[in-house]
Amino acid sequence: MKQLTLLFLVTITILSCNNNSEDKITIAPDSNNGYLSFEGRDDQFTGGTKMIPIVTPKGTFNVWTKRVGNNPKIKVLLLHGGPGMTHEIYECFDGYFPQEGIEYYYYDQLGSYYSDQPDDLSLWDTARFVEEVEQVRKALGLNSDNFYLFGQSWGGILAMEYALKYQENLKGLIISNMVPSIPDYMEYSDTVLAPKMDPDVLAEIMTYENAEDYGNERYLELVVNHYYTEHVIRMPLEEWPNSIQRGFKHLNPKVYVTMQGPSEFGVKGDATLKNWDVKDRLKTIKTPTLSIGSTYDTMDPKQMEWLANEVQNGRFHLCPNGSHLSQYDDQTNFFSGLIQFIKDVNEGIPL
């Protein structure tokens, strides 16, 4: 846990607070005058924010959500990555969804910064998180007439697992920058991405990896400067958006290390996600599904395309200039594909 805390501290220390203006796609203004109305809503007093009680085997805790907009036919719940990251990495959605009249919900999962953070490692379990999402869905009144579930990275794992158990509640499913197998992700990292690195840099990184010296400041510096800026968000560190900086600053390392492990080159150690794989179950998903991949991601975009073909009703969208956080480093392509999918599903257009 200490090494992950150091990693995020090093990242934040290197980052400046300057923000780069983001590209925007041209979208017609929303003509629905009721999009911002709070009429008939119970969250006006808090500006759309709602704390939702979540029942777990270890007690009841509260998770943070925030609604933006009104649309009875399109409601998108955003599942952040990490695990243990925050909704802050999705703040750029404010630049694209409102003018399309898309209602959407920010949500910090249990353990994340804006929600309760119980000190019990047994809670950081995929199956429990699935039940948490179901409780959030019920509390927000989402159903198969309007409920689109978006998940990126770990959020994509959670979205797949939710669909495998509760797809009857979904209108649409979006899996962004995630493959259906952690072992496949690790193989891609070891056999494809690692050999592309500068040999001297890779050799030095592997010295620390082999020694499990993940807290070494030199290791962290190498990871940030030679891996993050190539495969996590393809921008110079000084141009990383403030929302990303805050997301890293607020990440809960206890959740992250328990599920993901301490290494940035795959899921290692006794991390609970180490052997996660749902490839043989995807064919049971009937919900219209979008898989978003990126050319420079930490994971194989071809596997993301395979995912789209494996589900019964899928579409693949590639962000050719993007990496893991393609909503920032290939923003125009990312949102054009995402918005088009939501529109097509809403209008009944075949994928």
Predicted stretch roles:
Residues G84-G95:
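The serine-hydrolase catalytic nucleophile loop
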Residues F97-D116:
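Conserved alpha/beta-hydrolase
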Residues R128-N146:
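Conserved acidic catalytic loop of the alpha/beta-hydrolase fold
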Residues D145-Y188:
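Conserved hydrolase catalytic core segment
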Residues L173-Y214:
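Flexible "cap/lid" loop of the alpha/beta hydrolase fold
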Residues A203-K283, T287:
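Alpha/beta-hydrolase
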Residues K279-N321:
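Conserved loop-alpha-helix segment in the C-terminal half of the alpha/beta-hydrolase fold
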Residues G314-L351:
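Catalytic active-site module of serine/aspartate enzymes centered on a nucleophile-bearing elbow/loop
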